[in-house]
Amino acid sequence: MSRTVIGVMGGSSADAHTLAGARELGRLIAERGWVLLSGGRPTGVMQASVSGAHEAGGLTVGVLFDDDRAQAAAGLDIVIPTGFGAGRNVINILASDVVVACRGNGGTLSEIALALRFGRPLVLLDFDPGRDFLDACSVEGSESQWAIAPDAASAVAQVSIYLAAMGR
């Protein structure tokens, strides 16, 4: 019988609260005998969750963005270099029995969408990917890149505002 794989997704940069939650999550996954799968980078939620699982004696797998094993998180037992860039997110989701998403940015949002698309059960750890998430995904230093419109007329009005800001 194959082992249960829990995919832990989240930002490459994160605040202390998110990192502590990811580390605790990794520990709890390991204590249950589940395999922790992550994006495998040595930063943010990926490193924190791997560290928690590794310290608890769990098995950890990292599916890397690039083909450089030197970019792997400390504590990974299995490193899978892909060279697929963001395409590796599909592998992360399909290889997971259940996906847990921690606070992140655009990559995490794509993993959430892929989990839903491929029918993987999804748990959001201590965040709501609404307004805060959209703000986090926006290009730093720019005006707001998103808006919520209650009706079609308001949507067109907001489009006009964006176009005017672009000089169009």
Residue map of PLM features:
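Catalytic binding pocket for nucleotide-activated donors in carbohydrate/polymer assembly enzymes
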Residues: 130-145
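Short active-site oxyanion
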Residues: 33-36, 144-146
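A charged, well-structured terminal subsegment
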Residues: 98-99, 146-168
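Generic N-terminal amphipathic, Lys/Arg-enriched alpha-helix
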Residues: 2-16, 27, 31-32
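Conserved beta-strand scaffold positions in the cores of enzyme catalytic domains, especially
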Residues: 79, 122, 146-148
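Acidic/glycine-enriched connector segments
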Residues: 20, 27, 40-113, 117-118, ...
